[in-house]
Amino acid sequence: MWPLRVYTRKKREGQRLNLTPTPDLGSPAKAEAPPGSKRKGKVHGLSKIAEKAERSRQGGSGSGPFSPRLGVTGEKSLQENRSSEDTQDEKIASLRESVTDDLQVDSSSSNSELVSGLSLHHGMASSLLSYSVTDSYAEYKSFEESFPSPELFRKSDYLDWECPNLEEHMQWKNSTLLDTSKAVAIEKAPQFSNVSAIFSTSSEDYQKCHRKTVMTVADQNVSPKAKCASNSESDNAACEILLAEKTCPSTPEKTKKKKTNSSTPGKKNRGLLTSTPSSETAGFVIDLSSVQKASFEELFPNVSNYVNSNEIVPVSSLQENSSNEFPANASEICCIIRTSPGTRQVKNKGVIVKKKKYSLPKDTPQDIIIKMA
């Protein structure tokens, strides 16, 4: 409840100011408040209440009680002021709500339009994509159904769709999918009556080559003997040469060329080396009875650090001291040994460097010399 403001006036003689009048249940007294601000309405209402109170006091008897109309009219005027203020506040709130609702409606409508536009674009794109995918899938399925197998045909005319005789091209498929109706079983295939006839020609050629090699060896006077069948002095050397023949077949060819007689022409030697296969030479034994067995010291005397050219000793020089003589036409064998050279003292030669003193030119004055120094 709003506090009741009462304006006091000077006391009159024989009268008493009633600050708290008692309510009267008689005829209601209305005090209308004009529309306007709060303060103006309150001041207007209070002034009217005070005037009515004075009139009632003057009109009434001095001994009787004051009329309670003043309190009732004051309360009603206050209630009306409050109701008017409430209505104004409600109007302002309703106006604000309407403005915010309009703004929200506008923003929501614009957003809905944007969303609807985006959804329309997205829907159109997705529909176009789905339509293209379905078309391509249908074309692919129709292409697969037109051919029974995914493999290509051998002829290049299979892409010619205007060709009416497409069934003719179905006959030429890949080798993996050939028609098995024309296939022949392996059991019914024609077989060779004599398979050995195929291999007989190759075996005969091999025997002819073998005979030729034997004849060439016989012409060169190489006697095929048993292994290690030489004299007692050259047993070890013969065994070593036979082992070398088994491991590396190219070395005995060179030894045969050197040990054979020099009277035979060179063409026969070349024919022997080229015609005889390496696998056949391992079965032959070279007669090494005429080869001298010499010690390492006799062959290579005075070998300490390195070998000079004067120390290379030919085998023919040892022919006088040996008991077994070489044949007259035997070729000389020279042996050269490569060893690491010994350490040699290297003399350090001193290099003399001539130093010249720097001398200034004669034309330079003395003060410049001092600055430079």
From Swiss-Prot:
UniProt region (Required for localization to kinetochores), positions on chain: 332-335
UniProt keyword terms in alphabetical order: Centromere, Chromosome, Chromosome partition, Kinetochore, Meiosis
Ranges for region Disordered: 1-91, 250-276
Superkingdom to which the source organism belongs: Eukaryota
GO CC terms in record: condensed chromosome, centromeric region; kinetochore
Binding partners and assembly: Interacts with CENPC. Interacts with PLK1; required for recruitment of PLK1 at kinetochores.
Function field: Key regulator of kinetochore function during meiosis I: required both for mono-orientation of kinetochores on sister chromosomes and protection of centromeric cohesin from separase-mediated cleavage. Acts by facilitating kinetochore mono-orientation during meiosis I, when kinetochores on sister chromosomes face the same direction and are thus captured and pulled by spindle fibers from the same pole. Also required to prevent cleavage of cohesin at centromeres during meiosis I, possibly by acting as a regulator of the shugoshin-dependent protection pathway.
Protein name, per record: Meiosis-specific kinetochore protein
Originating species: Homo sapiens
